[in-house]
Amino acid sequence: MASLTLEEIETMLDDMKKKLNVVNASVITSDSVSPAKHDDLIALHAHVMRSPSFSISEMDEIVQELGQLRGRKS
């Protein structure tokens, strides 16, 4: 299981927000990402950054995935 710093999480989230042109950038913040979800964040970031473009439905799914990264800190 990966362990990311808040700075690393913030960078990944910023990368994805820019690529996806997220309007509500406050949807997820680095300190709201559950440590248990760091591997999921890494995988989602890799997927978003390697894809040249996304359909509206794909963007909706990605935003939903981002929302699922939130959780209690353990």
Swiss-Prot record:
Domain of life: Bacteria
Pfam families per UniProt: DUF1128
Listed InterPro entries: UPF0435
Name of the protein this chain belongs to: UPF0435 protein ABC2298
Family affiliation: Belongs to the UPF0435 family.
Lineage: Bacteria, Bacillati, Bacillota, Bacilli, Bacillales
